[in-house]
């Protein structure tokens, strides 16, 4: 899922008990992302200069912002008597990581819905309106319940069904719809001498991400996650049979239209990682697996 998120700039939500590596996985994402293009780097530098924070040593690297869950609305989205950019603007062309997502103020999280769609945030004051860029990739992490141990085989969870429901209701459906990849991180058995499973190293994974991003840039001028509706219709076409299959799947899983569109974007990224032009049934099926289980 991390590779897919990096390849298509998709929003990603990790869910799992404490100590399963959710934060560690999120911190690995910047290492998979391609460096900033020159025009992107200039935009990032201009934003950071407003806050008197220009880390020239990180010039080609994408921003990675990790605000605390106690952050206020102005700190996260921007504001003040003289409007200043918030964390979502400082994460422009980079990653915004929100750990313990349900612990953030719900009203603050709801404000994220607009920039997640438009790529900018508008701050209104009595005399004027200020528009800041906010084209960021959202990565978030959360526990499955207030105590964090729901579903653990040890039976440690002490939460009642009502407590679990109230905890999950802190995140609205429209906000969750804007997250492309929902991944449950399970706890693995602890071993003093764990067996290392062969897998893809970071360098080769980053190379695949760079190749996929280059395909997207040449084809449509942006990452798949940022495709608008006309771009989606043009670059995410399906065969008649697969389109019918997807419509049936969306009806059975009661997916919203926005969820279906984001599913198509993920399928487009899966095809790009395989370096194929067309979206196939297996790409759609895999993308469906990353929708929330509750749907």
Which residue ranges define each predicted feature?
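Conserved alpha-helical scaffold flanking the Walker A/P-loop in AAA+ ATPase domains
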Residues: 3, 57-96, 128-129
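Pre-Walker A (Motif I) flank of P-loop NTPase domains
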Residues: 8-13, 92-94
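Walker A/P-loop
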Residues: 12-56, 118
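The Walker A (P-loop) glycine that initiates the GxxxxGKT/S ATP-binding motif of P-loop NTPases
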Residues: 16, 78, 100
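Walker B catalytic acidic pair
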Residues: 93, 99-101, 111
């Amino acid at each position: 899922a991390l590779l897919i998120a990096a390849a298509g700039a998709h929003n990603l939500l990790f869910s799992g008990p404490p100590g399963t590596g959710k934060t560690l996985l999120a911190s690995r994402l910047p290492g998979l992302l391609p460096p900033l293009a020159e025009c992107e780097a200039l935009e990032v530098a201009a934003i950071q200069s407003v806050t008197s924070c220009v880390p020239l040593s990180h010039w080609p690297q994408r921003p990675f912002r990790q605000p605390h869950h106690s952050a206020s609305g102005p700190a996260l989205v921007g504001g003040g008597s003289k409007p200043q950019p918030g964390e979502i603007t400082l994460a422009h062309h980079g990653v915004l990581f929100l750990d313990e997502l349900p612990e953030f103020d719900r009203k603050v999280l709801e404000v994220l819905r607009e920039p997640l769609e438009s790529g900018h945030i508008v701050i209104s004051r009595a005399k004027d309106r200020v528009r800041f860029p906010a084209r960021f990739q959202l990565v978030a992490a959360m526990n499955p319940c207030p105590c964090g141990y729901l579903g653990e085989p040890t039976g440690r969870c002490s939460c009642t069904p009502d407590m679990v429901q109230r905890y999950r209701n802190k995140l609205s459906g429209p906000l969750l719809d804007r997250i492309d990849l929902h991944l449950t991180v399970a706890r693995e058995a602890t071993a003093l001498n764990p067996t290392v499973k062969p897998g893809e190293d970071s360098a080769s994974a980053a190379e695949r991400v760079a190749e996929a991003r280059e395909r997207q840039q040449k084809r449509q001028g942006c990452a798949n996650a940022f495709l608008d509706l006309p771009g989606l219709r043009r670059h995410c076409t399906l065969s008649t049979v697969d389109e019918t299959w997807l419509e049936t799947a969306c009806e059975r899983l009661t997916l919203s239209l926005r969820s279906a569109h984001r599913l198509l974007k993920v399928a487009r990224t899966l095809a790009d990682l395989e370096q194929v032009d067309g979206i196939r049934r297996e790409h759609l099926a895999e993308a469906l697996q990353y929708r929330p289980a509750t749907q």
